[in-house]
Amino acid sequence: MKINIGGGFKRYDGFLNLDADPLTNPDFLVKLGEDKLPFDDNSVDEVKAYHILEHIGHGFFQLMQEIYRVCKDTAIIDIQVPHHRSEVFYGDPSHIRFITVDNMRLFSKKYNKWHIGQWNSSSGFGLPLNVDFEIIEYEFIVDDHWKSRFANMSDEERNEVARNFNNVYGETHMKLMVMKDA
């Protein structure tokens, strides 16, 4: 089974839509971060979370636990969010949570254990929430304003620009893999 969480009016072939807004006519009316996802444990192969996670406030950790619960081992979570240093993020008052590669890494038990060993710090969410997501790929989408400027820059130069200026990247795309013990 494949699900599209918080998809609004956007539909994808083969995906069930979950949304809190009845006007979007979702397959399942669900308040993400508050309601349990209406699926059995280990029943979902893929989750699309396009421009929704940044809208989830206090229920964010509950939502991550619910996604983990319903997903099968090796399920893919496909995430797209506004980049945390873009006006796209800041321009919408309903964007209340930064979603970054660094903060999503905190949902990895492997990373949590490494962090404990390296720094004697239990910083992370994978172990205390009993979830395990590994980032398998990510990409920062260059804002249109910067595309032509980046054409002749080296990777090092691009990274330097992105460290020093806002609005270089418009979106962050990443894929997580659900890791469950056999």
Task: Give the location of each predicted region.
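Conserved SAM-binding loop
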Residues: 2-83
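S-adenosyl-L-methionine-dependent methyltransferase catalytic module, highlighting the catalytic core
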Residues: 57-62, 66, 72, 76-182
